[in-house]
Amino acid sequence: MKTIIAIFSLAAMIVLVRPTPLENDEWTRSIINVPCKKCYKKDSNGVCRKIFGCQEKRNIIDPPCRKCYKKDSNNKCVRIAGCGNEAVKRAIINPQGCARCHKPDPNGKCRKIHGCS
């Protein structure tokens, strides 16, 4: 019986010794002054809570197109006509979009120029 009373009194002392947070202490002020991230706002206790219905839009950076591809008007990567192994090896593409030693035909396809090397 004496051990139960001793444990109870020890637990009571621990609870009483624990300091209570004050509104003016430095730690509490630092938490209250920290701004919430987008789509969150502080409640009356200083805790950041999500705003209902708010959607976070992430800034997604478009990766560049691979070799033999270029961006079209819709910002999509489309294959450059006639670009093949030769253009990939030399990485030389003329303004019409065809590889070196190629020219566009009336149908828009790139054709090899005879005798060009």
UniProtKB/Swiss-Prot annotation:
Keywords: Disulfide bond, Nematocyst, Neurotoxin, Repeat, Secreted, Signal, Toxin. Sequence repeats lie at residues 28-56, 57-88, 89-117. Contains 6 disulfide bonds. It is found in: Secreted; Nematocyst. Expressed outside of acontia. Its main location: secreted. Putative neurotoxin. This is Structural toxin peptide sea anemone type 9a. The lineage of its organism: Eukaryota, Metazoa, Cnidaria, Anthozoa, Hexacorallia.
